[in-house]
Amino acid sequence: MSNILQSVPVNQKVGIAFSGGLDTSAALHWMRQKGAIPYAYTANLGQPDETDYNAIPEKAKAYGAELARLIDCREQLVAEGIAALQSGAFHISTAGVTYFNTTPLGRAVTGTMLVAAMKEDNVDIWGDGSTFKGNDIERFYRYGLLMNPALRIYKPWLDDTFIQELGGRKEMSEFLIKSGFDYKMSVEKAYSTDSNILGATHEAKDLEELSSGMKIVQPIMGVAFWRDDVEVKREEVTVRFEEGRPVALNGVVYSDLVELMLEANRIGGRHGLGMSDQIENRIIEAKSRGIYEAPGLALLFIAYERLVTGIHNEDTIEQYRESGRRLGRLLYQGRWFDPQAIMLREAAQRWVARAITGEVTIELRRGNDYSILNTVSANLTYAPERLSMEKVEDAPFSPADRIGQLTMRNLDITDTRQKLGIYNDVGLLTGNTSVALPRIGKDSDKK
């Protein structure tokens, strides 16, 4: 039996994730006119482009909400963001520049905390502004049903009647004005923006064309570092971790992770750190393109990864990276709280993050241009004297030890040579100019 309603649930409570923008304002008032009883829930995610959260619930009541609540999600969102950082849950990157899954993290928190608030008010029908082509419709569906198995979904944007009556921004604006609201439609940007305390996503409209680059975006968490008239000064910053948790920036200790993230955003934002242009696969396997900002997470990630590589061995780092990519994809798909994701996340937090204690000094320049100046940790397994080119006392191994080690390599070198000979005999290497290998002959040919 489907949980999705395709027409207005008359005389029933409907919870709507209310942002205060045109779409949700028009939808809320329209549902009220059609006989539904709207309950508005607004998530305070620390959106950098939101100036007055307290005004949003009052606006919802004016549009017809029976009840309007503001839910502070910032602490939980930052906690989930740090968990993603600790486990490297980022699978989308281009040429080493990472997208930090900030929108999927925001949806995980919004989808669970708002539905939990709805349950307190005995609201079992939920609506939001996600469209049928995007990722969010599935993310919210999964998280909502995880929190409330009795939940039903009503999305105005899946209702043909709503689409016919209010099919676009112009129609929605006219509808509100006709209903007596002094609504002035904002100047439409060349792209859409969604943000939270962890990062911002810019996509759609002009950005759907790959010929439109990052330069058409006005950053909301940083500076347009590509512009010559924007002054960006070099800056040294120190980041300290204790047992995998960021605790200090530039020597200032933060007991509140929300305040630490805000300061990290300010520092990274001064340089445009963490901006990226990505082509990605949506959940439905169609490709989309986005311009992303995440100045604070990018700063913390540089320091965290530096400590990871200085503390852990190669196999642990490999496992951390492989599991992190898998976990990042699960997060992107709306499966952050699924058992397979919890297993990957908690393994990384326990066995990788808990060893990460130390301080990293970084010089930030423009955009993602930076240098690591110093790394200090009592847990470092990096020891320069082990491989020093100078003569050292108590060397960990001698030339004779290396001769023995190289001699043991003869076993796999011989095996490799035999396999290459087999490939040559069956014609796999003959004439293959893409494989830069010397000609392999049989040992018997040299006798």
Swiss-Prot record:
Listed under subunit, the entry gives: Homotetramer.
- Which amino acids does the record list as binding L-aspartate? 131, 135-136
Q: Which keywords does this Swiss-Prot/TrEMBL entry list? A: Amino-acid biosynthesis, Arginine biosynthesis, ATP-binding, Cytoplasm, Ligase, Nucleotide-binding
Which catalytic reaction applies to this protein?
L-citrulline + L-aspartate + ATP = 2-(N(omega)-L-arginino)succinate + AMP + diphosphate + H(+)
Q: Which residues bind ATP?
A: 17-25, 43, 129, 131, 136, 194
Does the record bear GTP-binding in its keywords? Answer: no
Annotated L-citrulline binding sites: 99, 135, 139, 192, 201, 203, 280
State the EC number(s): 6.3.4.5
Q: Which InterPro entries match?
A: Arg_succ_synth_type2_subfam, Arginosuc_syn_C, Arginosuc_syn_N, Arginosuc_synth, Arginosuc_synth_CS, Arginosuc_synth_type_1_subfam, AS_cat/multimer_dom_body, AS_multimer_C_tail
Name where it's found.
Cytoplasm
Q: Report the sequence similarity comment from the record.
A: Belongs to the argininosuccinate synthase family. Type 2 subfamily.
Tell me the CDD domains matching this sequence.
ASS
Look up the domain of life of the source: Bacteria
Please cite one Gene Ontology biological process associated with this protein. Answer: argininosuccinate metabolic process
Name-wise, this protein is Argininosuccinate synthase
**Its pathway?**
Amino-acid biosynthesis; L-arginine biosynthesis; L-arginine from L-ornithine and carbamoyl phosphate: step 2/3
Q: Which PROSITE patterns match?
A: ARGININOSUCCIN_SYN_1, ARGININOSUCCIN_SYN_2
Coiled-coil spans are none
**GO CC terms on record?**
cytoplasm
Q: Name one GO molecular function term.
A: ATP binding
